[in-house]
A protein has these predicted regions:
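Single conserved hydrophobic/aromatic residue that forms the stacking wall/gate
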Residues: 1-8, 12
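A glycine- and Lys/Arg-enriched "phosphate-lid" helix/loop adjacent to the NTP-binding pocket
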Residues: 74-113
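A short, basic/flexible loop-to-alpha-helix module at the beginning of a structural domain
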Residues: 13-21
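Solvent-exposed alpha-helices and their adjacent loops that cap or buttress functional pockets
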Residues: 20-24, 68-71
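Short beta-strand-centered segment that lines the nucleotide-binding/catalytic pocket of NTP-utilizing
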Residues: 52-63
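Hydrophobic/aromatic beta-strand patches that form the interior of the parallel beta-sheet core
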Residues: 53-55, 75-79, 128-130
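Glycine-rich phosphate-binding P-loop
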Residues: 29-46
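Small-molecule kinase domains that catalyze NTP-dependent phosphoryl transfer to phosphate-bearing small molecules
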Residues: 14-15, 99-140
């Protein structure tokens, strides 16, 4: 962990897969499909002093290969949610942006597939996973901090 202001300024650089060249400097890396609260959780963790990055999980190719190495130091946590809840969140997001176009982003079958694929990737890499469906950002962050502390004992 580091000072809050330093962690907070770093978190903005490392959101949504930006600046993946220095992921090794992170304490925690969050992975998840779109709208699984990666960014707000990262910001919350940064305010607690944890250097946090997040990577959107589009498919297995969207993951930097070096983080799948067993000796990769940062704590990696997968975030998942129920497909139906994700469908509602994404639909509301598009409505708030005044976009009502139906796309794969809001196709329930595609979302179910996306969520299942993310779970398979998390299992394959033995990354701890948190279901954020009915959790607040604070509850999710508390679980992540516990995982981080266990990993770094």
């Amino acid at each position: 962990t580091q000072s809050r202001s330093s962690a907070a300024s770093d978190v903005y650089k490392r959101q949504d897969g930006n600046q993946t060249d220095d992921l090794e400097k992170s304490d925690i890396i969050l992975l998840g499909v779109s709208r699984t609260s990666k960014t707000p959780t990262s910001i919350y963790l940064a305010n607690k002093g944890y250097k946090t990055s997040n990577i959107p999980l589009v498919n297995e190719k969207s993951i930097p290969t070096r983080i799948t190495n067993k000796n990769f130091k940062p704590c990696i946590v997968g975030l998942t949610t129920e497909a139906e809840r994700l469908f509602d969140i994404r639909k509301n997001r598009l409505n708030s942006l005044k976009e009502n176009e139906s796309t794969e982003y809001t196709n329930l079958e595609k979302i179910k597939e996306e969520v299942e694929n993310s779970k398979k990737i998390f299992r394959k890499n033995q990354w701890p996973t948190i279901d954020v469906t009915r959790k607040s950002v604070e509850e999710t962050a508390a679980s992540i901090i516990k995982i981080y502390e266990i990993k770094n004992r």
